[in-house]
Amino acid sequence: MAEPWGNELASAAARGDLEQLTSLLQNNVNVNAQNGFGRTALQVMKLGNPEIARRLLLRGANPDLKDRTGFAVIHDAARAGFLDTLQTLLEFQADVNIEDNEGNLPLHLAAKEGHLRVVEFLVKHTASNVGHRNHKGDTACDLARLYGRNEVVSLMQANGAGGATNLQ
């Protein structure tokens, strides 16, 4: 069951409707209210719209809340390659080393999907644990190698993040 205003807030965020979102937020609604699917507005927001994220975060949205599948918004942004949204989340103290249900960090997901700019940012400009192994024992570089993301592998190796691998 949805919490009060959860559906409306999530719907506005998912559509990227900044006007409706702002109007709802002015009514002091619970910014972490869940919709009927158990997800918050931040979790369903249009990822390519960092201003939606910024508005929600300014009102106190928790960037580290996980959905039922174990993903926080930073996992979604990294996996989908939305660097601008990922940077906005980090500005508001999202945990760059938060694990999903499989032990993957945002870096693992970006590397697996081949999002070179996201991987580069995470490796060079954050405290992302590049040597972290997921529950299967794979590092982000292992996943990049496994999925044929050769540019990502080269970038990680050039920045000292290629280390020991399960795949050798």
Curated annotation (Swiss-Prot):
- Give the record's keywords alphabetically: ANK repeat, Cell cycle, Repeat
The record's subunit annotation is: Heterodimer of p18 with CDK6.
Name of the featured protein:
Cyclin-dependent kinase 4 inhibitor C
Q: May I have one GO cellular component term? A: nucleus
Q: Give the ANK repeat ranges.
A: 4-33, 37-65, 69-98, 102-132
* Keyword hit for Repeat: yes
* Keyword flag Repeat: yes
Taxonomy, superkingdom: Eukaryota
- Where expressed (tissues)? Highest levels found in skeletal muscle. Also found in pancreas and heart.
Note the InterPro entries from the entry: Ank_Repeat/CDKN_Inhibitor, Ankyrin_rpt, Ankyrin_rpt-contain_sf
Q: What does this protein do?
A: Interacts strongly with CDK6, weakly with CDK4. Inhibits cell growth and proliferation with a correlated dependence on endogenous retinoblastoma protein RB.
Which gene produces this protein? CDKN2C
